[in-house]
Amino acid sequence: LAERSQKDGQAINAFCKRLYDHTFLAKYYYQKPEKIGRGTLQSAPNIRRFFAGEWLEWFALMKLLAFFQERRRAVSCTRNLSVIFPNEDLHELDVFFLVDGATPVCIECKTGEFRQEIDKYLRLKKRLGIDRSQFILCCTGLSDEQAAGLSGMYELSFVSPAGFVAHLSKLF
C-alpha cells in the first residue's frame, strides 16, 4: 500500500479488516512500517466462489431487482439457471430474468478474462433466440469506451458494473 495515497491505504486496510471481522479472511496482518497488508482467504467453498466472481452475479441481481422495483415492473429472475438444449448441451446462465412475463434477458458476469469466451456467448445468444441488447456481458475492468467498442463489434451487449443500470434504462 506504500504506493497508494494515505487515504486510499487507510480505506483498503479498513476494508480488509472488515473482511477479516466478517470471516471472509482467515488471517489478516498489516505491517505498518512497510505498509503491506497480508491476508489469507477462508477455505470454505462458498467464500472462495464469492471471491472468484460470484459477487458480481449478486451485484447484477440486486441492481436489476432495485431497478424494476423502482419502476414498479413485474420481473421474475434467477441466478445460476441450468439450461439443457434438445441436443443435451448444458449451459449455466449467471443471471436470467423475464420482464412482464415476456421479455427475456440473460446476464453473464465476468471478473476475469472473457475474450476467449466471446464465441461461446455468441452461440449461446443465438440458441436462446434473444436480441443482442438482451444478452449482457457485465465485465469488470471495462471502460465505457471499451464496452461500446465491443458492443459495436459483436452481437452482444458489453457493460461495466458502473454502466449496468444505464444499459437497463435503455432497454426498459
Question: What are the language-model segments listed below?
Answer:
Residues L1-F172:
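Intrinsically disordered, low-complexity Ser/Thr/Pro/Gly-rich regulatory segments
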